[in-house]
């Protein structure tokens, strides 16, 4: 059955021809693939199913020849193109015309207005840059479906995401699309899922605190369900929850501890499966002084009491310097310390301390005999390691170091991370930290040496290095110097011109003698070094700047599932920019993973990312400063502040021109606009004042490091 519904007989030649058409420049056997496809044909088989079958056969052959893997992705991409509309506007119109529209009114109207320029800039050939498994992942969960049938192409999705982030600014949208479609970066999964939709929840990471009460516990569980429903990954810290056997004053009873509560979290994660696209995921963070620590370490194990198991949760520990110091002493043969466990109800405050303050309070409670129990620290450590070996968790984070190097010291103590343990932000039961993420693809930022000038190579017939050098060059003029006397004259001439002794071939020169722009390369080894690919740091910095603008937009456009998330994001405006493809990059640069050059490159990469992001963040703040320091803004802000004086300042935003301002930003502006010290920071996020960066401390300062590749201009 063809894609248009017409029935016809299957012909081997047609199957083979389709395979052959898609196998340009591939070393594969179209006949073999066609034979295997035809051997599995049944009555009523659809053409699209034949393509699926052919792609699966190719993937089974890719271990013998990697070109079959390339053919597999060409087949599935071609099949997707045959099943979907090549017009972006028509595809979006289809999504919008559903009974419950899949894209927002704002996005649809923006597309209608810019239809022609959008269609002109979309490039469907870039779909073929995605491999088989990449496309299948996108097809399964990311590309929009109607009645179970995929209607989007990869480029449709990328353009939708870009337009959804930059409604009203077509140039910024097309620039963002260009970067994404060329695979310089990708946005986080929720952004790809929901950008441009009616409920655009675009954030990946949520960090949640829990209050030790029935209302607090079940509110947190409900909030986790709402966040998970919209594809958010969650980290919850539960140190404040009292332990098993702890007294409950309200009922004159005893607490059952954290495990029964965690079982509710576990079932919630299983039930609320992110809109059917992927499983809900929650990580639970605990400090090792909690009395339920031993039971906590067992919850993911495959044996034991089923009532004590929560295998769909991830576990994590926030370890202190004190714990690690006592552990180190025990491992190195000192007296083994009996680690004390304290109930949060009887011994409050430990989870809100770090460093020396934590140590002081810990020993204060210990001396007051408030410990619920004590356990040899080596025994506890072995329990932790055993759990990691068996289940892969708990994650281990170091609370003191996290807080020492935090730019949120002016806000509070960081007590947990997120689901994947790469984001550290302040959170409590009043504000849930969240972060919008994006990932830069380093492997797509490699520059190959492009030789577009004349190349002259002096060689001799029986020279293996000459032959090897010619294989490296795309084009060249070969000057064969087999005569020994002629070679001696050549060596003398080159030695005179270059001011150094030349006594071997090959010798490679690039350029035009007439224009006198000849560049001497050298021999075979020098040519290899000359042609070596390099990393494009300029592209890296430009990518960072595009991402900062995009993620800043995400904060304002996002649909927040609960007000605590909005409060946190509007106050702190955190951005999470990371990398992928590091090993692929090293392979392309021909750098060993453990080499000194790799270590230096790693540092240089992250220095460039850090400073480029800071620079663009500063530029955004300056743009806002220039808007906020006008007389017109002062009049507008005064009216807004007076009219909404009873509103929560961190939950309400107002649009002025193309920018959005929270009521808190407006209040800060009105309070400090004439203050010579704080007034200059108007335009920054509201909790910037008092932060380490506000006081001139960069992240590397907090780590007691200095930049190695970028000049510190302070």
PLM features: what roles do these ranges have?
Residues 1-449, 532-714:
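Extended catalytic cores of very large enzyme megasubunits
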Residues 294-295, 467, 471, 492, ...:
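Alpha-helical elements of the RecA-like P-loop NTPase motor core of helicases
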């Amino acid at each position: 059955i063809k894609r248009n519904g017409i029935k016809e007989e299957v012909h081997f030649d047609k199957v083979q021809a389709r395979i052959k058409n898609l196998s340009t420049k591939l070393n594969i056997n179209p006949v073999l693939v066609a034979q295997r496809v035809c051997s599995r044909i049944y009555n009523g088989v659809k053409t699209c199913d034949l393509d699926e079958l052919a792609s699966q056969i190719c993937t089974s052959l890719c271990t013998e020849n990697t070109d079959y893997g390339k053919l597999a992705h060409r087949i599935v991409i071609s099949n997707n193109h045959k099943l979907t509309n090549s017009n972006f506007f028509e595809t979006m119109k289809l999504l919008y015309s559903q009974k419950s529209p899949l894209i927002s009114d704002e996005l649809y109207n923006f597309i209608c207005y810019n239809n022609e320029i959008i269609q002109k800039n979309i490039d469907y050939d870039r779909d073929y840059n995605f491999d088989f498994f990449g496309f299948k992942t996108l097809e399964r969960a990311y590309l929009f479906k109607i009645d179970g049938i995929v209607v989007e192409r990869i480029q449709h999705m990328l353009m939708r995401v870009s337009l959804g982030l930059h409604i009203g600014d077509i140039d910024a949208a097309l620039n963002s699309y260009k970067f994404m479609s060329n695979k310089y970066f990708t946005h986080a999964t929720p952004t790809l899922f929901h950008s441009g939709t009616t409920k655009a929840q675009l954030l990946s990471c949520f960090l949640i605190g829990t209050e030790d009460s029935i209302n607090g516990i079940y509110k947190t569980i409900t909030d986790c369900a709402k966040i998970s429903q919209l594809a958010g990954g969650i980290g919850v810290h539960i140190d404040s929850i009292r332990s098993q056997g702890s007294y409950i004053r309200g009922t004159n009873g005893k607490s059952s501890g954290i495990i029964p509560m965690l079982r509710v979290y576990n079932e919630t994660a299983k039930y609320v499966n992110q809109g059917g696209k992927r499983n809900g995921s929650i990580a639970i963070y605990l400090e090792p002084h909690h009395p339920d620590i031993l039971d906590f370490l067992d919850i993911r194990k495959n044996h034991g009491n089923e009532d004590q198991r929560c295998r769909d949760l991830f576990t994590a520990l926030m370890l202190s310097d004190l714990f690690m110091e006592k552990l180190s002493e025990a491992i190195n043969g000192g007296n083994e310390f009996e680690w004390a466990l304290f109930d949060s109800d009887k011994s409050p405050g430990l989870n809100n301390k770090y460093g020396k303050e934590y140590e002081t309070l810990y020993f204060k409670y210990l001396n007051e005999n408030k410990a619920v129990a004590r356990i040899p620290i080596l025994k506890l450590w072995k329990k932790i390691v055993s759990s990691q070996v068996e289940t892969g968790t708990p994650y281990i984070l170091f609370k003191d170091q996290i807080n020492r190097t935090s730019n949120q010291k002016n806000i509070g103590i960081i007590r947990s991370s997120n689901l994947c343990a790469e984001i550290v932000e302040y959170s409590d039961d009043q504000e849930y930290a969240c972060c919008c993420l994006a990932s830069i693809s380093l492997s797509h930022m490699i520059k190959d040496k492009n030789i577009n000038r004349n190349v002259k190579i002096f060689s001799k017939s029986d020279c293996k290095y000459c032959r090897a050098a010619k294989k490296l060059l795309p084009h060249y003029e070969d000057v064969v110097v087999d005569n020994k006397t002629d070679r001696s004259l050549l060596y003398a001439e080159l030695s005179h011109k270059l001011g150094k002794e030349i006594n071997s071939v090959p010798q490679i020169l690039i350029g035009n003698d007439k224009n006198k722009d000849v560049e001497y390369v050298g021999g075979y080894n020098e040519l290899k070094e000359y042609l070596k690919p390099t990393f494009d740091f300029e592209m890296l910095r430009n990518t960072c700047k595009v991402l900062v603008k995009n993620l800043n937009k995400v904060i304002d456009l996002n649909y927040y599932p609960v007000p605590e998330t909005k409060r946190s994001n509007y106050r702190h405006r955190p951005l999470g920019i990371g990398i992928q493809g590091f090993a692929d990059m090293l392979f392309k640069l021909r750098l060993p993973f453990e080499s000194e050059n790799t270590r230096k490159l790693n540092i240089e990469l992250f220095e460039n990312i850090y400073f480029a992001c800071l620079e663009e963040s500063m530029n955004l703040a300056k743009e806002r400063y220039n808007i906020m320091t006008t007389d017109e803004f002062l009049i507008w802000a005064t009216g807004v502040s007076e009219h909404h004086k009873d509103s929560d300042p961190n939950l309400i935003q107002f649009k002025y021109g193309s920018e959005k301002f929270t009521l808190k930003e407006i209040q800060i502006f009105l309070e400090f606009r004439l203050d010579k010290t704080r007034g200059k920071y108007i335009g920054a996020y509201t909790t910037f004042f008092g932060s380490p960066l506000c006081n001139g401390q960069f992240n590397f300062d907090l780590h007691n490091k200095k930049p190695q590749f970028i000049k510190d201009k302070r």
